[in-house]
Design a protein with these regions (language model features):
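A short alpha/beta connector and helix-capping loop motif
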Residues: 24-37
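Long, well-ordered, tryptophan-enriched scaffold segments
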Residues: 30, 40, 46-78
Length: 532
């Protein structure tokens, strides 16, 4: 299988919960462990397949060996004397939350907050943060921090309830009054667990109405309103133009509260980048027309155009692009260099770029490298992320960041080859701070070892055949005679060109209907082109 033979995987293959429909076929395809097991149905399926000869003992033994190797490796690495340091574990959780939070918006320098400013924290998530997923991903944490406990002296108002969506007038009015009396209002908002969890899909990108209503009401009386988000994925923000700052925490783990305060007050400089695009509305998403499918069939009509590959290729207006993330400092990109301008099969090219911290505080920048392919037969995204590196810089400091590209960096999966393929041509190497903020671009010429095999049929169009040198040599003169004949029939020379353009879209087998070629002649031409 590609998993083991091509990619070199040596571990165990485990199914998703309840994903097996035919245990014997699964083993033959490389499955090892079925989850959940124990009902006996899988065992009976295996025994029946062995007896019927549709599953070999060799295939079954391979799955058993993979399981035993895994058990053996776990046993060898067990450490009975290991001590779980809960404090160290929590400190790590805080650090992860601090480094992954994304500053989406920060107008007028509202953030970081000045120490001692009169701030108010609003929203139930300030006291009870949504910090982890639901369902089987849920864990029992030893320690969870909330923002309030790490911001002593800061006023608080609940503002909304997470167990319902309707506005609570008393809670909202108290929050709005507190916001109007403060210098800065920080609203902790997002999605309750009931909005997104294991086992079901989200049907909306909207937050609960009571939260959206609260943000709008607070922003109307407090120009310095900051929104801190707790959510598992992208959301709509109908209020985004009314607030100067938005900090995306996502589901930030045990240290969510402490990390939020450190980021808000500048003890830590935000450095996270979006790993997804935030569309403006649900109807903008690539799967909108085909989700959730019909009956038992899901149609993946978007193909490879998922996420930023879709939004950037269609130049869609998005809320926040893939890779976006601000900082309390600024970064300058310069001196993009490629170690070679032409690369062939088996060769690599090193791409280097210099990044400088041009601001007044230390910060981290995630440098992103995108590759834009030449136009070819296959529809490909306008650009794809092929590398990224996070670099830490003091004020005024510069560092050189290096990436290595090879054939795989330029390739796409070609169904006809059952493998990845990079077509010859000029590729753009783009470096920047997001998929929409590309600072520098270089050119790389790629020379494939072999052209992509092309197979023409009677259903191929004249335009397609004309892209092949042998096809153009044979079909070209035929096209010219047909166009000239059409021009002679009308008596207008200009009709030659228009007739030629029209004919490019017809199929080869139409030439038989036009009495231009016989079926035998067409088959001979196809054989000659395909064997060239």
């Amino acid at each position: 299988s590609p998993l083991r033979k091509r990619w070199g995987y040596e571990g165990m293959v485990v199914t998703d919960w309840g994903a097996v429909k035919d245990r014997a076929k699964g083993i033959a395809a490389g499955q090892d462990l079925e989850m959940p097991g124990g009902s006996g149905r899988g065992t009976n399926s295996i025994l029946s397949a062995i007896k019927a000869g549709t599953l070999s003992e060799e295939e079954l033994n391979a799955a058993v060996r993979n399981l035993l190797r895994f058990v053996d490796s776990v046993t060898k690495t067990e450490n009975a004397s290991a001590v779980f340091d809960r404090d160290a574990d929590y400190r790590m959780a805080v650090s992860v939350a601090e480094n992954s939070a994304v500053l989406l918006k920060n107008e007028k320098g509202v953030l970081p907050l000045a120490k001692g400013c009169k701030a108010v924290f609003l929203g139930e998530f300030a006291q009870h943060p949504r910090y982890q997923g639901g369902g089987s991903s849920h864990v029992n944490s030893a320690k969870v921090s909330c923002a309030l406990e790490h911001a002593p002296g800061v006023a608080y108002a609940q503002g909304y309830r997470t167990d319902e969506d309707t506005v609570d007038p008393a809670l909202e009015q108290a929050a709005v009054a507190a916001a109007a009396d403060a210098e800065v209002a920080v609203i902790f908002a997002g999605l309750p667990e009931r909005y997104e969890s294991e086992g079901y899909d989200r049907t909306t990108l909207a937050m609960p109405e009571n939260q959206n209503h609260l943000i709008a009401a607070v922003a109307a009386v407090q120009p310095n309103t900051v929104v801190v988000l707790h959510n598992g994925s992208a959301i709509e923000m109908p209020w985004v133009n009314d607030v100067p700052a938005v900090l995306e925490l996502y589901l930030a783990g045990d240290g969510a509260g402490e990390a939020a305060v450190n980021l808000l007050y500048g003890a830590v400089n935000p450095s996270g980048k979006l790993a997804e695009t935030f569309p403006r509305r649900l109807s903008d998403t690539p799967a909108y027309l085909s989700f959730p499918g019909e009956r038992e069939t899901s149609v993946y009509s978007e193909g490879v155009f998922v996420g930023y590959r879709y939004y950037d290729t269609t130049e869609a207006d998005v809320l926040f692009p893939f890779g976006h993330g601000l900082s309390y400092t600024t970064f300058e990109y310069s001196v993009l260099r490629l170690s070679r301008s032409t690369v062939r099969e088996g060769e690599e090219v090193q791409v280097t770029v210099t990044v400088k911290n041009t601001g007044a505080v230390a910060g981290k920048e995630t440098v992103q490298l995108y590759v834009a392919p030449p136009k070819g037969e296959r529809h490909r995204p306008v650009r794809e992320l092929k590398g990224f590196a996070k670099v830490s810089l003091q004020p005024g400091e510069s560092k050189e960041v290096q990436f290595t590209l090879d054939k795989r960096s330029l390739a796409y999966y070609e169904p006809e080859l059952h493998d990845f393929y990079a077509e010859s041509g000029t590729y753009q190497i783009c470096v920047g701070a997001s998929s929409r903020d590309l600072r520098l671009t270089g050119l790389l010429e790629w020379q494939a070892a072999q052209p992509l095999p092309v197979h023409f049929t009677a259903a191929s169009t004249l335009k397609q055949v004309m892209t092949h040198p042998v096809g153009a040599a044979i079909i070209g003169p035929i096209l010219q005679r047909m166009a000239a004949a059409a021009g002679s029939a009308t008596g207008k020379k200009d009709d030659d060109d228009s007739s030629l353009s029209m004919m490019m879209g017809i199929q080869l087998n139409t030439l038989i209907d036009f009495h231009v070629l016989t079926e035998e002649q067409l088959n001979g031409i196809l054989s000659q082109i395909n064997q060239a």
